[in-house]
Amino acid sequence: AGFTGSEVGNKYPKDPEVLKKALELRGVEICNQWFSSFLITKPFEEVEKEFRAQLAFLKAMGAKVIGASEQSHSVQGQMDTPIFGHKYEMNDEEWDTFCTGMNKLGKIAKEEYGIALTFHHHMGTVVQSLAEVDRMMENTDPEYVSLLFDTGHFTYCGEDPLEVVKKYVHRIKHVHLKDIRPEVVEQVKKENMSFLAGVRAGAFTIPGDGCINYDPIFKVLEDAGY
């Protein structure tokens, strides 16, 4: 199909040697993998141990990026919890713990593994809106924490992805391109559907099949040398 890169899928082999062989047959390299952090609900040492194990795997695969998402109190995987109006809001102490932890993880990733930590904002998590992304970006070190820019998740929660990419293009080190069907998002709101139910109903789609205008977004990324 012409693909040269892939993120690590849920069903991919966990042994790097096995995965390498499967990918080499297809001319594909690994670029990134999701990491679930629980910085405000688990001891940092526990999160760090899991993080290091995943970094070692990604380094063996030759990847340069890890995409972290804070999953403490996340409702994204709860089938019966409406995605709108039910997400957890961090207090000031939790924000401090979260941002301090992200800085520590990012420093480990960069200095010990040569991998960039990119933070993945996500529907149903503690960092979903632009205001929450702003607070995280303001309180983390650009040297160690970058943004995983996801067009779909920003649009889903009512933000303008073009505004975001203009604001943070120089801290974006990974991009997810999703499109949104606004009529399905409206259905999700009206029927108090969960995130997973919304996915199944078709809230997300491929670029060009939804409401996002990608041309200006691509121009900002290209002009910045992404």
Where do the language-model regions lie?
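N-terminal small/glycine-rich loop or linker at the start of catalytic domains
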Residues: C31-S37, S74-G85, S194-G198
